[in-house]
Amino acid sequence: MILREEKGFTYGARTRFSGSRLPGTFTASSGVRSNTTEESVNIFKNLMTAYKNPINEEDLKFTKNVTLRSNARQFETLGALRRMISNIANYDLPFDYINNQEKIVREMTIDSHNALVKKYIRPDEMIYLIVGDAATQLNGMKSLGFGNPVILDKEGNSL
């Protein structure tokens, strides 16, 4: 919300967890104007670091509502239904797994939320991938304290 509503840097920023039978990833992403890259990355960094702070009841309620409402999208289109059925088959899930997930979300407490954040959100282990012109962006990225950047060409080869 900061990047879009407060700063006007982007039309949207998103986060997601993805997984399979193997451990998955947490991704936070956004497309921003080149002249806002450094500040935008710093906002992401600060937000991720702020997850260490305990959540309050209002934020927990908001998160629960967003999560529960987003489940409705799993039933909106034939493609979404196909993906849900595919997940049931691929991961040997019970047919009512959505109900089970919603129950877990409804029963989430501040303490259980904070324990999950502590376990899975580890900003010091995150990889920041910035796509842009190194000539204009590299110095700004160095100033954020991420260590030495790895610069890749468009084919993914180290430069």
List PLM regions with ranges.
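Non-catalytic beta-strand/loop surface segments
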Residues: M1-E38, R83-M84, E102-R122, N148-L159
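Non-catalytic, conformational "gating/processing" segments within enzyme and secreted inhibitor domains
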Residues: D124-M126
